[in-house]
Amino acid sequence: MKTKISIAFLILLAAGIPAWAQSGTAPAASSQVTAILAGRLIDTDAGKILEHQVILIRGERIEAVGQGLAIPPGAKVVDLSKMTVLPGLIDCHTHLADGTEDNTGDPLTYLKKTSAEVAFESVPNARAMLYSGFTTVRDVGAYRALNDVAMRDAIARGDIEGPRMFVAGSYVTITGGAGALTGIAPDITLPWNLHYGEANGPWQVRQVIRKLANDGVDQIKILSSGAVLERGSNPNSQEFTLEELKAAVDEAGHFGLRVACHAHSTQGIKNAILAGVTSVEHATMIDDEGIAMAKARGTYLVMDIYDEECIEAAGKANAIPPDFLAHDANLGQIQRDNFRKAVAAGVKLAFGTDAGVCPYGTSGMQFAYMVKYGMSPMQAIQSTTSAAADLLGHTDEFGSIRPGKFADIVAVDGDPVQNVRLLENIPFVMKAGKIYKQ
């Protein structure tokens, strides 16, 4: 629905704006103040719905939230009184800076294009994520090293539209591993940015992490098992050793960086947890022992349980090689069943989709699968808001609608706690106080 915007409080009274938005003591008037009238507001910290709330925003941040807040003269009013308002969504596993979607594993995809071409191709990816309601993403690796750093900074400057990004800069991977560009003849020398994160042995791992820290990354992405969409890789295999993973976590800690670890295999998952990573990505073949370990250590799992649909569709369209489909055989259902077990066990789970496997802007499709496989709609919403902010270490900045936090706000018609599929098509998006979609 279209929002109704007015700038004069007296006009609001005459127009019949709800009484719950008119009483109370107003803060000082300011042309920078925006007032959102929320018919329903999802309190993601408490896991409950509040009725008839006013959100006062000054600049980029929320100033006050509550019933009966007066709207200062001159404020811009956004009437969402017939909608449900919730914090901007967070996808904790994306790959926005890799250009156009390509899951063929063909190394020529990267060798035919300059870094500049890939960067320009990636701009629509960021916009699609933002306009689908995701105001923050944790971008966990780019084949073109540091393209994600440049994209993050361009968004922060306002040069391009996109979500707030937390980036990894590159993949920390073994030679020929799940994060390496494979299928290249041994006498071909790759450009530096196509093998930037390769490391073998604990000291090389530390060296790579030191480089990435110097490059200004927000986190480290390391891979402890093979991958599905990678030539010559096997998701059941172990890649980095426990010793190497521990070195990564230790070195990252020196720079205040958290570690996300790709792991499909049972042992790869356990090694990642033992090493002390912040999150295990995919966690496909986690067993009961691994689930117990994750719960005991407070390790987050980020399980992309919607991707199977996109991989199958791409396979039918011959857009994915047969060996990739062989890797994927039965893994999707195994991952979903293990997701259900993790939910039942009370393991920390954060929302992440591996955006780029499925088309950018479709991350919201995963919510229905999370509910189908064990979460309540409120738990699914919390996984993409308060839990995701906790995983990122920024609960003071976003993840709930609270004074002092960024004004990252989305709204839907209807109640997503009753119908979580409403989050597949979000009609109102605000990031840091600026409306991008209404």
Give residue spans per PLM region.
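Histidine/acidic-residue-rich catalytic or RNA/ligand-binding cores of hydrolases
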Residues: 100-104, 148, 177-178, 230-232, ...
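Histidine/acidic residue-rich metal-binding segments in metalloenzymes
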Residues: 150, 203-301, 329-349, 396
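Divalent metal-dependent hydrolysis catalytic cores, especially in the metallo-beta-lactamase
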Residues: 121-148, 161-171, 217-230, 258, ...
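Active-site gating loops and adjacent loop-to-helix segments of metal-dependent hydrolytic enzymes
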Residues: 97-118, 175-194, 228-242, 297-332
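Bacterial N-terminal signal peptides
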Residues: 6-18
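His/Asp/Glu-enriched, well-ordered alpha-helical/loop segment
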Residues: 108-110, 254, 258, 322-323, ...
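Metal-associated gating/positioning segment near the N- to mid-region
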Residues: 83-153, 157-159, 175-179, 243, ...
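Histidine-rich, glycine-flanked metal-binding segment
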Residues: 24-27, 41, 46-86
